[in-house]
Amino acid sequence: QGGALSVVASAFSGLSKKCYVSEPSYCCLHKRLELGSGVFGAAKDYLRRYPEYTDDALDTLTYFDINNIVSCLKIPTDFCLALADPVCLPEFVYSAYAHVDAPKQIHIYPFVPHYTPEDYDYFVHSEFSKL
């Protein structure tokens, strides 16, 4: 949730100078629900038992989907994309990145699972020292 929170805080606070996004799990929520990946496995099971709530659930999830919030970013944004992440699927993270309508950069890490690579941590720390 940290990656998603950085987007929300940066998009709506008006205080951020730059947004750093690593492992934003709240991308393409309708697809995550369909796949049942991560925390959405329980929600998928629930909707399988109670399909009459599916439309309401999908409508509500759109409010929390980072893909619908990144367009509010007006500051430079930096994404970390781990290609072997089974939780924050790379294609979903890239989709959020593609929706950013501000100066943006993406750091791609092949073979990296669900964690922030040390190299990206160093990059972010060096950037903070410049702000």
Language-model regions, residue ranges each:
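C-terminal catalytic histidine-bearing segment of alpha/beta-hydrolase fold enzymes
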Residues: 94-131
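Short beta-strand/loop motif that positions the catalytic acidic residue
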Residues: 73, 78-81, 85
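Short alpha-helix in the alpha/beta-hydrolase fold that links the catalytic acid
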Residues: 75-77, 89-98
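Hydrolase active-site cap/lid region
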Residues: 8-52, 108, 116
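Acidic catalytic loop of the alpha/beta-hydrolase fold
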Residues: 83-88, 114-115
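Active-site nucleophile elbow and catalytic-triad environment of alpha/beta-hydrolase enzymes
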Residues: 53-69
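Glycine-rich nucleophile elbow surrounding the catalytic serine of serine-hydrolase chemistry
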Residues: 1-9
